[in-house]
């Protein structure tokens, strides 16, 4: 038995078994209490984009994080009831465009009910390997192929292997904390 198989067996043995779907379990914490607490967890602001057979689509997200650097993989969480969900599932590619401090209004466009064409018309885009839209002046863009999707509650967690990236050294970052945007100033090396 390999170390990975042994570890998985140990994890499976220690996790409680249940036939009840996660969404039907009684919550130990109230939904609003949880949301209020999560608002205190600051994060980068991202516009997630895709293009392909399912169409061109994009949405604003803060539920993005690194998974591993070998292979370079990140995750993106997407509500299955979101209007853009079918496009992302069908295309199986996406780009995580991490926003600069000048992108607050663009974040609001992609986070609302603005028609998709108007969202994309508000900025300049290019593409790299997958054909997903790359925001030309993003702080960083991670061009990805979706390698795995896991359902948890109301959301799909998309695990995405980074196949290309692009960094911009000429801007500062944008964070979302306590339901407000905050600029993040980069340290300039001498």
Swiss-Prot record:
<keyword id="KW-0288">FMN</keyword>
<dbReference type="GO" id="GO:0042602">
    <property type="term" value="F:riboflavin reductase (NADPH) activity"/>
</dbReference>
<dbReference type="InterPro" id="IPR012349">
    <property type="entry name" value="Split_barrel_FMN-bd"/>
</dbReference>
<dbReference type="InterPro" id="IPR019917">
    <property type="entry name" value="RutF"/>
</dbReference>
<dbReference type="GO" id="GO:0052874">
    <property type="term" value="F:FMN reductase (NADH) activity"/>
</dbReference>
<dbReference type="GO" id="GO:0008752">
    <property type="term" value="F:FMN reductase [NAD(P)H] activity"/>
</dbReference>
<keyword id="KW-0520">NAD</keyword>
<protein>
    <recommendedName>
        <fullName>FMN reductase (NADH) RutF</fullName>
        <ecNumber>1.5.1.42</ecNumber>
    </recommendedName>
</protein>
<keyword id="KW-0285">Flavoprotein</keyword>
<dbReference type="GO" id="GO:0010181">
    <property type="term" value="F:FMN binding"/>
</dbReference>
<comment type="similarity">
    <text>Belongs to the non-flavoprotein flavin reductase family. RutF subfamily.</text>
</comment>
<dbReference type="InterPro" id="IPR002563">
    <property type="entry name" value="Flavin_Rdtase-like_dom"/>
</dbReference>
<comment type="function">
    <text>Catalyzes the reduction of FMN to FMNH2 which is used to reduce pyrimidine by RutA via the Rut pathway.</text>
</comment>
<dbReference type="InterPro" id="IPR050268">
    <property type="entry name" value="NADH-dep_flavin_reductase"/>
</dbReference>
<dbReference type="Pfam" id="PF01613">
    <property type="entry name" value="Flavin_Reduct"/>
</dbReference>
<dbReference type="GO" id="GO:0019740">
    <property type="term" value="P:nitrogen utilization"/>
</dbReference>
<keyword id="KW-0560">Oxidoreductase</keyword>
<dbReference type="GO" id="GO:0006212">
    <property type="term" value="P:uracil catabolic process"/>
</dbReference>
